[in-house]
Amino acid sequence: MVNNPTAIEIQQTKLYQQWGLTDSEYELICTKILKRLPNYTETGLFSVMWSEHCSYKNSKPILKKFPTNGPHVLQGPGEGAGILDIGDGQAVVFKAESHNHPSAVEPYEGAATGVGGIIRDIFSMGATPIAILDSLRFGELNDNQTKYLVQEVVAGIGGYGNCIGIPTVGGEISFDPCYQANPLVNAMCVGLIEQKDIQQGKARGAGNSVLYVGAKTGRDGIHGATFASDEFAEGKATQRSAVQVGDPFMEKLLMDACLELILQHSDWLVGIQDMGAAGLVSSTAEMAAKAGTGMILDLDQVPQRETDMSAYEIMLSESQERMALCVRAGYEDQVIALFKGYDLDAVRIGEVTTKEQYQLWHQGQLVADLPVAALTDAAPVYHKDQAKPERLATFAAQAPYVPSVTDTQATWLALLKQPTIADKSSFYRHYDAQVKTNTVVLPGSDAAVVRIRGTKKALAMTTDCNGRYLYLDPHVGGQIAVAEAARNIVAAGGQPLGITDCLNYGNPEKPAVFWEFDQSAQGIAAACETFGTPVISGNVSLYNEFNGEAIYPTPMIGMVGLIRDIQDITTQDFKQVDDLIYLIGETDDNYAGSELQKMQQGTISDQLGHFSLATEKANQDLVLKAIQQGLITSAHDLSEGGLAVALSEATFKQGLGYHVQVDLASRQLFAETQSRFIVTVKAANQAAFEQISDQSAQLIGRVTAEPIMHIQTKDEMIDLTVEAAKDAWEAALPCLMKSEA
């Protein structure tokens, strides 16, 4: 057996620094909290529990700015996932998580275990997972390493979700140079639950038992939480030991067993929590902390797949497919028998105590004896310095970017080929989107839609964020991220209910990065107040840098909305010849951060144009009202690529064309002014629609049988066949993925 360093040796060699603790944090532990030197195992426990990934020590002051309450909120931040009331005794459960650093090192396993972890968060609440979504960011596809990352991440997401039998129904993929060495892999899971079955991760009741269930513990993922709380450098790209390895078939058994316990034997169960980041220590210490209790654990009882594991390794392992249960005394044998019936390990490893102390025994020795609060509530909270990035002053001094569009048709086709805009079906065809046969609107739409069996209702769900906008203006960009998510939900016929988030940023110790974080959070909060969408769960991923270069601020917004009647489900495709086409919202010369600017200049700059939350809300309310009154046959939000791209996307499914006339310069077809929709209305409903639109909708054309897109601008008439546009859009990514860099 390896002799671990003594407490004095840890202090003298500053080993704690390698595990992510600072000198001041170590001093706080020694002099204020324990009033002694922590031993090897205890130092390891502090290092992961006080990491940013677990403690949110840098982000807590920012997260407090989010609205978390609302009429539908049943569970806000603080548990495995958030929960919203959707009526009839039912609730929707959802959360998003990041797995950025692991996916950069081992993209398949990093992405797969990210999906597995977020699924466990959902069923730990007692909910049946019904959908997975993802939000992915990569560098440019002219790089072979990026192509490899894309292939492996997509395969990892699909491989895990498909095997476990949960449909991957939607998401988004964007490409920008800032993500070249630091990809973002954010996964979101949505579940359904009867409100009476809601569970919490609390270890209540002295004498109740702590059970370990699921897969055995190995050495994979040790210090994964610490790994996720540091930035990349050249030498750190090989930290594969910090990446977990997943088994979706084991997860399926674990999910089924947990749901059987919750739904059929809830009287046996006190609390349940996933062993995610920081593994066994995080799950058990948090369960005790939330209940105001203590815990004694016997680590010799923990099922292990490797020999001679130390207490440190057992506690910090992030082996996948494991859960911690608090079981009512006297029911241990029944619970163990239930899990063994699924061929899963199930072992009593400890018990709940009244004394709020966290004690670990291993091989007959007390290897850790800490106050529970020391690991959870006592973590320091930092109020970081802030400074406005210098680039913003440079952008403000520049003349506004106005694109030169000399060949409108060529520009239109070129935009359709841009990786962020182009057809993503070559990626999402790896996902089974229809397993369980509840998916009504498939990937590639504004929002995915999943029906709720036994009711007339459905859920709309989406993930959204444009990091370019946040790079130019974090506050307004944060507002736009929420606004676009809500716009997508509304376009599908849903009422936005709430959000989860993955807040992806660079190193918070840099004042400019922390300023971006704070400003964007304020923007998100303001938008959430406007749309009535509280933040009910989420995740913070900081230190997304490589060799000192940060990603764009990228706060991914995952939103869920309720479609009150499946008859309200609306899709983006034009459906019937002679339907009238309306543009809702004004179009200005907004090109800052646009796909056109990136395509023409190779970079982004300038100040974002004016954005009004009030206008956004009014336009969304109009569209939703029209949908619910049965006046709209299709709806599509305008985002990357502007009006020309949105109109094109509306033609691709049915192959219908259109005649459109707009009082715009040709270049404005590609402007990315916010708060806009295109909708189609039957001619018979024209008067009714225009009556409720109050002049905020402009009639710009009609749908035609001829598969040609005709657009008359103030400058010219542009014609483009649907076939040519669709071919360009569909072929772009497969060609890029096959080409040699």
Curated annotation (Swiss-Prot):
Its EC number is 6.3.5.3. Mg(2+) 2 binds at D121, D274. Pathway: Purine metabolism; IMP biosynthesis via de novo pathway; 5-amino-1-(5-phospho-D-ribosyl)imidazole from N(2)-formyl-N(1)-(5-phospho-D-ribosyl)glycinamide: step 1/2. It catalyses: N(2)-formyl-N(1)-(5-phospho-beta-D-ribosyl)glycinamide + L-glutamine + ATP + H2O = 2-formamido-N(1)-(5-O-phospho-beta-D-ribosyl)acetamidine + L-glutamate + ADP + phosphate + H(+). GO terms for molecular function: ATP binding; magnesium ion binding; phosphoribosylformylglycinamidine synthase activity. The keyword ATP-binding applies. One of its GO terms (cellular component) is cytoplasm. It comes from the Bacteria. Substrate binds at S98, H99, N100, H101, R120, Q244, E318, S319, Q320, S541. It is an enzyme of class 6 (ligase). ATP binds at Y56, K95, D501, G538. It holds the Pfam family AIRS_C. Belongs to the FGAMS family. Part of the phosphoribosylformylglycinamidine synthase complex involved in the purines biosynthetic pathway. Catalyzes the ATP-dependent conversion of formylglycinamide ribonucleotide (FGAR) and glutamine to yield formylglycinamidine ribonucleotide (FGAM) and glutamate. The FGAM synthase complex is composed of three subunits. PurQ produces an ammonia molecule by converting glutamine to glutamate. PurL transfers the ammonia molecule to FGAR to form FGAM in an ATP-dependent manner. This is Phosphoribosylformylglycinamidine synthase subunit PurL. The gene is purL.
